Structures are given as structure tokens and as C-alpha cells.
């Protein structure tokens, strides 16, 4: 199933905004005092990066 370019672009923008929020949280040294929270944020960050990469690949498809 192919989503329209506009939908994919909005999805990328939304995920990139969430990624920036996670980057802000991960930049806070206090986060690392709670290992479980830090692991959760890193897991979410990695998942979002993979989703964004996949969306960019779909956007590049003819």
C-alpha cells in the first residue's frame, strides 16, 4: 500500500519533532540517574530513527 507523498512527509515531520524532543531529554544528565528511563528513551529514539529512515525510503520510491 502506497501512502501519498504528503501523508509520508507529514509523518516524517511528526516523527522528527518527536525525535527532537527525545534528543532534548537525552541531553539532560539527570535522565541517566534513572537507568530504566534512560533505556526507554534510547529505545524510543532508535525506533523513531528507524521509522524515519523507512519513511524516507518509501518517499524515494517511484
Each predicted region: which residue ranges?
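Charged, heptad-repeat coiled-coil alpha-helices that serve as long linker/dimerization "arms"
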Residues: 1-62
Amino acid at each position: 500500500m502506497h501512502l501519498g507523498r504528503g501523508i509520508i512527509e507529514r509523518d516524517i515531520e511528526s516523527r522528527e519533532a518527536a525525535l527532537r524532543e527525545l534528543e532534548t531529554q537525552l541531553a539532560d544528565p539527570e535522565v541517566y540517574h534513572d537507568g530504566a528511563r534512560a533505556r526507554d528513551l534510547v529505545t524510543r529514539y532508535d525506533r523513531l530513527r528507524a521509522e524515519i529512515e523507512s519513511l524516507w525510503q518509501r518517499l524515494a520510491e517511484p
